[in-house]
């Protein structure tokens, strides 16, 4: 999946940047959507590239990173600024394991998955950041998927997990009602 995101990390920890158009596709999606956006990415290098590209086009005040390297004392301020409709902070770029739990980001009208993981709980929790009490607008969800790659397999696995959960829960509900 790192290759689909435009780089490969060697066993020694060196990054090799690869040609890819995922960042271009992200910028196209961002340009097509007005309003605030949450962008989830599972890789630090990807988060840094997203920040760099968004900052170049929209300015430093419009972008905030929220992942493991983000200082604890800065995290609450980032959320507060993102939730302020008058704040210039338009893009919340984060790792779903860091920002996907326990925070409210319902000013977002778009949620973009730059990369996904097989972790359904993390996916559902990160989706719920934009759907909280107080959300008044509809939210658009976008998965950036390179055709014929691991991206498709991951999203298919997530859908299968949701379908399985629905079947199990529905069966349990039916049994409980008897």
Task: Give the positions of each predicted feature.
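SF2 helicase motor core recognition
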Residues: 47-51, 76, 90-115, 119-138
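Residues at the C-termini of beta-strands that transition into short coil/loop
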Residues: 67-69, 115, 145
């Amino acid at each position: 999946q790192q290759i689909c995101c435009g780089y490969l990390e060697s066993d020694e920890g060196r990054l090799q940047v690869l040609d890819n158009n995922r960042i271009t596709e992200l910028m196209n999606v961002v340009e097509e959507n007005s309003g605030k956006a949450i962008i989830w990415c599972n890789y630090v290098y990807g988060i840094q590239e997203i920040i760099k590209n968004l900052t170049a086009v929209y300015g430093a005040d419009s972008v905030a990173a929220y992942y493991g390297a983000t200082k604890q004392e800065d995290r609450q301020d980032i959320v507060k600024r993102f939730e302020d409709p008058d704040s210039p902070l338009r893009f919340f770029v984060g790792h779903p394991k860091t920002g996907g739990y326990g925070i409210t980001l319902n000013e977002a009208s778009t949620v973009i998955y730059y990369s996904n993981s097989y972790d359904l709980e993390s996916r559902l929790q990160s989706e719920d950041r934009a759907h909280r009490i107080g959300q008044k607008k509809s939210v658009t969800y976008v998965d950036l998927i390179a055709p014929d790659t691991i991206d498709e397999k991951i999203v298919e696995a997530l859908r299968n997990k949701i379908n399985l959960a629905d079947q199990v829960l529905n069966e349990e509900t039916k049994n409980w009602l008897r």
